[in-house]
Amino acid sequence: MSIQLHDKVSLLILDFGSQYTQLIARRLREYGIYCEIVPYHEKLEAIKAREPKGIILSGGPASVYEEDAFLIDKAVFELGIPVLGICYGMQLMTHYFGGVVAKAEHHEYGKAEVIFDALEGSESKLFEGCHSGKVVWMSHGDKVEKLPEGFTRIAHSTNSPFAAIAHQEKPFYAVQFHPEVVHSEEGALYLKNFALGICGCENDWNMHNFAEEQIKKIQERVKSGKVLCAVSGGVDSSVVAALLYRAIGEKLIPVFVDHGLLRAGEREAVEKMFKENLHVPLITVDASEIFLGKLKGVSDPETKRKIIGETFIEVFDVEAKKHDGIQYLAQGTLYPDVIESVSVKGPSKTIKSHHNVGGLPDWMTFELIEPLRELFKDEVRALGAELGMPREMLMRHPFPGPGLAIRIMGEVNFEDLELLRKADVIMLDELKKSGFYDKTWQAFTVLLNVRSVGVMGDNRTYDNTVCVRVVEAIDGMTATFAHLPHELLERMSTRIINEVDGINRVVYDISSKPPATIEWE
């Protein structure tokens, strides 16, 4: 399964399963270079049809010398366009051209200093304007032992004699490290040099052009029809509604479904926001009993997500029948949602299902409109600013479509939802008062499926445990736990335990992404 957003693209990134692949696209887009990610097994004819100006081979967990290695059609190197290999991509390039790749005696993970070798001619283009001795991020267990014929070394590190290589005649380059990771000090410049200096890509990707293009596409597609827009009150769906309203005006029918899994005061805040800030008429549907009824007895997180996604569609279908002329359903699907729903191993190996991804059931009569499906989160915020939306709306922390259902471990019920809402209000109140809310990417509480013994007064308790999760991130692709002051964490814990009956223990999640994900389910 391949996700194609545009007929043509400046750069194609072939994904071999690296946890950092999406970061490659993000770094390039920061320079205004449009690119897309496709699975490594994309058909050669499909690649040629896109007419890319260059190809990037991502990193990945496999080894090129193993039987089940992720391989590509060698004809990719015969398309007459530049190719950049990153980590596994470098080993694959070495392997294909007759070099030797072997298991390293010592794995190399973390920071390393890269020294440029004597550079001449085209071999220097990758590092043009950059400085030798800068820190990069290594993450590999294999190494290149012998270069293929025609290749030369252009950089090395203490543990990697071949930290970067280049073909002496053809525009083929490869690096053993990850330039896309923020720890690589000038890594983004290497990617920029490849895209602009070597491939000759254009850097005209920006939100003004994107907005104008999408408005035109929406108008041409919708014409005299009507669009039902799924609204959650989060940044994504709010930007979708604002974009659609700009494009088609009264032909937009925005529907906010209260599925009973919202945070405290969420419904009222959403209704106020649409009325006062967006000036878009909003229809609210209370479907909490329907959702909670279908979730009864369900504890598996994947099943919960699917039930919620299917029920959303059913509710919207009922609402659509109340209005004549509705042909389309609009959703706030983002590019990471699309990518994460397609594994590099093919459609049978889905990494993670997403409630917005996968199309509509056969019984539905309207078509999907997903104007944000090629954007990352920070690009959505930039688009919102381009549309004139207020900052306080755009900078709200992300909130998942399935809501609190995936922040309650196990079965979801009304009592646990109330417990979690109360704890969440306290945590967010303390975070905002301390000034850390705007400094963090996402903050929430999780009700664990764990009870523990406690003592309150002279009485023994056996109550619930709540986990506080606060992370820092640039785009949500990677994240680190926020190093909050102990005094702040103590205030959160004390207030939650004292003010919320049924909770006697609070813990703080100090996991980063990867290896953990931001949400628990």
UniProtKB/Swiss-Prot annotation:
It comes from the Bacteria. NCBIfam families: guaA_Cterm (TIGR00884), guaA_Nterm (TIGR00888), PRK00074.1 (NF000848). Residues 205-396 form the GMPS ATP-PPase domain. It is an enzyme of class 6 (ligase). Pathway: Purine metabolism; GMP biosynthesis; GMP from XMP (L-Gln route): step 1/1. SUPFAM superfamilies: Adenine nucleotide alpha hydrolases-like (SSF52402), Class I glutamine amidotransferase-like (SSF52317), GMP synthetase C-terminal dimerisation domain (SSF54810). The keyword Nucleotide-binding applies. GO terms for molecular function: ATP binding; GMP synthase activity. Catalyzes the synthesis of GMP from XMP. It comes from Wolinella succinogenes (strain ATCC 29543 / DSM 1740 / CCUG 13145 / JCM 31913 / LMG 7466 / NCTC 11488 / FDC 602W). GO terms for cellular component: cytosol. The gene is guaA. InterPro entries: Class_I_gatase-like, GATASE, GMP_synth_C, GMP_synth_GATase, GMP_synthase, GMPS_ATP_PPase_dom, Rossmann-like_a/b/a_fold. PROSITE patterns: GATASE_TYPE_1, GMPS_ATP_PPASE. Residues 10-204 form the Glutamine amidotransferase type-1 domain. Homodimer. The active site is at C87, H178, E180. Its EC number is 6.3.5.2. This is GMP synthase [glutamine-hydrolyzing]. It catalyses: XMP + L-glutamine + ATP + H2O = GMP + L-glutamate + AMP + diphosphate + 2 H(+).
